[in-house]
A protein has these predicted regions:
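Glycine-rich, N-terminal phosphate-binding loop and its surrounding beta-alpha-beta segment
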Residues: 43, 47-122
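A short, glycine/Asx- and small/polar-enriched loop/turn
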Residues: 77, 209-213, 267-271, 353-359
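N-terminal, Lys/Arg- and Ser/Thr-rich interaction peptides
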Residues: 1-18, 142-156, 210-219, 292-306
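Glycine-rich, mobile lid/loop segments that gate access to catalytic sites or pores
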Residues: 106-247, 251-252, 257-265
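Internal helix-turn-beta structural module
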Residues: 335-399
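N-terminal, positively charged regions that mediate nucleic acid binding
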Residues: 1-53
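Long, well-ordered mid-to-C-terminal structural blocks that present hydrophobic/aromatic surfaces
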Residues: 237-304, 313-336
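Short, hydrophobic beta-strand segments
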Residues: 18-20, 81-88, 213-226, 307-313, ...
């Protein structure tokens, strides 16, 4: 394990920029559906005859190709959007069919019911399961027994991948992420849209210079709920005032925040941000896994980012998923235990034992944190307590 004290906390930089693609953004939907399918398949394997997570990766989910026209108070569906679940997935175990098309379809439908609640499967959106078993490794995706799933007993790094995580979130990151979360009601078992007239394809962008944070939030109104241009502008002004108050509370005096919602309200080229069903997949936009938020729910170009997107990858052994979650857990734990900002870097060569990672780098700010021996003992203890895949089989809605 390597420990250095050379990190400059991102909040100490003179300029910081952060973006979040909201839950209804096409890329975020693709990430979420891929993850939901992987977790549903993993749970089915653990609860059923295999008793272990079988080989799969569904990290190439594609969404798009819909077409809906909109006008004040109405819309017309011309072509449904499509969710194509691309990847590979074990189709049988010991000769018994696992029903993977049903698992894929039901998992995607459940996820869409939460984060794209205005879409109706089979009507405005179509789900196309498409996981194959093509490979040059015999019985890899059609195992006759767990002897054909060697990683069930001896998990090895499936790839040479670098994963990095950071804690805590900077004030800018906190405001940008939580501002989109504020558009959801988190009081139940699953989140629900807070406003019945607001769509889910939201993007929040923050630009900080010194203590001044400018936030631009692109928030769609549902066209059926908008009676006129004047009604649109009035609702946007109301949303802007409400989100400004939330942003001020989130900043808690650490930043001076200016929040703007759909700021272009007049002039040549003006275009209202209205959607019929809440996501731009309805008008030709496309979503693909790995093009959006990192595991922490943000896009921050000033922080190093993992080389792998974890969404849809096997939670039992895929390096880019396991190390992504482990790095974030370690960063959170170090910050909680010692009260310092830190970055955690993890990697292992392909084929090496998965846990513990062969290479661990903990980076702290100069002059901060515990001694090297105390930090090493703590990190090794936390790594030993990490369970694969158990710690990863949780639907992390707020990520």
């Amino acid at each position: 394990m390597h420990i250095s004290r050379t990190m400059t906390p991102v909040q100490d930089l003179p300029v910081e920029t952060v973006e979040r693609k909201g839950f209804g953004h096409p890329d975020t939907l693709a990430d979420g559906i891929a993850e939901a399918v992987s977790l549903a398949f993993s749970r089915a394997c653990l609860d059923g005859a295999p008793g272990a997570v079988l080989h799969h990766n569904v990290d190439k989910v594609y969404i798009g190709a819909g077409h809906i026209t909109r006008r004040y108070g109405a819309h017309e569906l011309l072509k449904p959007a499509v969710v194509r679940i691309n990847g590979r997935m074990s189709a049988s175990f010991a000769g018994e069919d696992l029903g993977i098309e049903r698992i894929q379809t039901e998992a995607a439908e459940r996820y869409l019911s939460v984060f794209a609640p205005h879409y109706r499967v089979g009507e405005s959106i179509v789900i196309e399961p498409n996981a194959t078993q093509h490979t040059n490794r015999p019985d890899w995706f059609t195992p006759k027994s767990l002897d054909d799933v060697p990683d069930a007993k001896d998990p090895r790094a499936s790839d040479t991948a670098l994963c990095v995580a950071h804690a805590p979130a900077s004030p800018t990151e906190h405001v940008v992420r939580e501002l989109e979360y504020a558009l959801w009601d988190w009081s139940g078992d699953t989140p629900r849209p807070r406003f019945c007239d607001v769509g889910q394809d939201v993007k929040v962008f923050g630009w900080r210079e010194g203590r001044t944070l400018d936030v631009t939030a692109c928030v769609p109104l549902l066209s059926d709920s908008v009676a006129s241009h004047d009604a649109y502008q009035e609702r946007i002004r109301h949303l802007e005032s409400e989100l400004q108050g939330i942003a001020d509370t989130l900043a808690d005096g650490r930043l001076d925040v200016r929040t703007r919602v759909n700021p272009t309200t007049s002039g040549e080229g003006y275009r209202e941000y209205m959607l019929a069903l809440g996501s731009c997949i309805e008008c030709g936009e496309e979503g693909v896994v790995g093009r959006g938020n990192a595991l922490n729910g943000l896009i921050n170009p000033l922080r190093p980012r993992s080389m792998e997107s974890p969404f849809g990858k096997n939670p039992a052994y895929h390096t880019g998923k396991v190390y992504g979650h482990l790095a974030q857990q370690l960063a959170d734990d170090v910050h909680a235990r010692f009260g310092v900002a830190c970055s955690v870097w993890l990697t292992s060569p392909n084929g090496f034992p998965l846990l513990p990672p062969r290479n661990v780098w903990i980076e702290l700010a100069p002059g901060e944190g515990p001694g090297d021996r105390e930090l090493t003992d703590f990190v090794q203890e936390r790594m030993a307590a990490f369970q694969v895949p158990g710690d990863l089989l949780v639907q992390r809605f707020r990520r």
